Amino acid sequence: MQAVRIGVTTATLAMLSTAAAAQAPGIAFGKNEYLRSCASCHGVSGKGDGPVAKSLSKPPTDLTRLADNNKGVFPVSRIYEVIDGRIQVTIHGTREMPVWGEVYTREVRTRAPRAMPDEMIDAMVRVRILGLIEYISTLQAK
C-alpha cells in the first residue's frame, strides 16, 4: 500500500510540475534558448545568416519562411521532430544541426536529482523545445 501511495504522490507531483513548467517559459524563455542554441547558425533574425553559417556544408534554413514554405501554416510538429532528432533535415547534410532533444536531455539529467523520474525529465525537455518553437513562430515573415 505504501508503494502505491508513493507512486500516486510522485505522479501527482510530476503532473503539477509539468503543468507549472508548461506555463512558465513564454516567449522570453524561447528567445533565450534560441539565442543560446540556434542563432550561431540561423542568425539572430532567423534568416540563416549566423556567424557559423558560412562554415557549414549547406546554408541553414531560413526560419522566417517556415510557415510560407508550408502553405501558410506554421509546422509545429515537424519543427518539434527536427529539434528532438526524429526527423533528419536533408539540407543539413550529415546532420550538422545538433539533435537538441538529446543535448537537452543530457543537460537535464546532469542537473536533476538522481531520483527524478524519466517522465519528469522528458517533460522538462518538452517544455524547453516548445518554448523554442513558440519563439521561432514569432520570427515568421509577415
Question: Where are the model-predicted features located?
Answer:
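Extracytoplasmic electron-transfer domains, predominantly the class I c-type cytochrome c fold
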Residues: 56-119, 132-136
